[in-house]
């Protein structure tokens, strides 16, 4: 939950939003707001949702890390999210490599981590948790590698287009404004 270009936004994974135009966003203590999907990049796997104020959350300033090269390797990272059945968790790790248009990290992740915001120690936003790596054992058996987390980098976005889409988006004021808003999965269970 951030303030970007004078608006409140939630940034998540594009595969969470799919092709929806509005989403229900959960705060804490039962609070729910509805946001308009302002920008989606399925190739990078990032979506921006413009939301009204979430009273049970504190918005941080959107400060994107625009670097995307091997100088990121070794950078200490933190992400916060609602993986699996857990409430808010904070996980730390570091950048291992830059590969296939993503930032590959060494930090714990599991199903339900997708969309969690990833920040460096200076508070710059690197992107979102996009997925965990999958390795193969003999006979084609695939297993999740929970310590290798793929981050969709915000540095690969068209920042001017993101700004235009955020500024021109409608901010829904009530949950009833969009009665069919789909809620993203939270805590590994459908809302």
Model-derived features: where do they sit?
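Catalytic-histidine neighborhood of serine endopeptidases
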Residues: 3-54, 72-73, 131-132
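Terminal peptide-recognition signature
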Residues: 8, 12, 35, 49, ...
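Residue "hotspots" at secondary-structure boundaries inside conserved domains
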Residues: 15, 68-70, 117
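Acidic surface patches and DE-rich sequence motifs
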Residues: 27, 83, 120
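Short beta-strand segments
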Residues: 31-33, 58, 91, 150
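C-terminal cap/linker of serine protease catalytic domains
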Residues: 56-58, 125, 129-191
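Flexible, gly/ser-rich surface segments that form the specificity/activation loops bordering the active-site cleft
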Residues: 57-113, 129-143
